[in-house]
Amino acid sequence: MSEVSKKSGDVTVTELTEDGKLVRKIRSFVRREGRLTKGQESAMDNNWSTMGIDFAQQMLDWKEVYNREAPIVLEIGFGMGASLVEMAKHAPEKDFIGIEVHSPGVGACLMGAEETGLTNLRVMCHDAVEVFDYMIPDGSLETVQLFFPDPWHKTRHHKRRIVQPAFAEMLRKKLKIGGTFHMATDWENYAEHMVEVMNAAPGYKNTATDGDYIARPDDRPLTKFEARGHRLGHGVWDMKYTRTE
């Protein structure tokens, strides 16, 4: 059973067992409301019917979504969407779907997709974990991307980090055998946490050949934020795991 409680404008669903014990659920985000610019709002109005997917408790049919069969790349938390649009532009042979809860980011992504004339990109504005639970067919994803998620750097907040054992198992089921989970972070402590979780997760193999990390792949665009970090001497850690079973 569940109880719904409202807190700071957000809705939290608390799952309970039959004897009243709390079941901690994974959460992929902390909601951040924001105001859309006129351009973002216009992009939402003009493009949602063709590029937006509404949340529903029903599995997606990728062939129906994209009107073709192609490898599916899913990104969790794409921010303002610039990198996702860039990746979709340079890989027209693949189909991309981005999930983001920040509506201005979704609007900005649709603006970029419209300006670029993309037909291989879809977006959702919802909690990624619920989307995975209810809408993503098992064994259907070629790649899952998680770039620069909230590091929750305070020790007492580490339990809020999205990369946890249950999350790794959920993703494993949705990836194809041989599919990849690509992560990137600019927090070394979070990178270490990611490696610790993923190295222990069954059914995955770290693709790094020397140590735990890989060089930034050419297909992951260098963001302005990341380039600035490089100039200031800040590190970025990329990790890629394949589903083996």
Curated annotation (Swiss-Prot):
Coiled coil location: none
UniProt organism field: Photobacterium profundum (strain SS9)
Superkingdom of origin: Bacteria
Annotated substrate binding sites: 154, 186, 223-226
GO terms for MF: tRNA (guanine(46)-N7)-methyltransferase activity
Name of the protein: tRNA (guanine-N(7)-)-methyltransferase
Catalytic reactions of this protein: guanosine(46) in tRNA + S-adenosyl-L-methionine = N(7)-methylguanosine(46) in tRNA + S-adenosyl-L-homocysteine
Any Gene Ontology CC annotation: tRNA methyltransferase complex
UniProt xrefs under HAMAP family: tRNA_methyltr_TrmB
Active site: 150
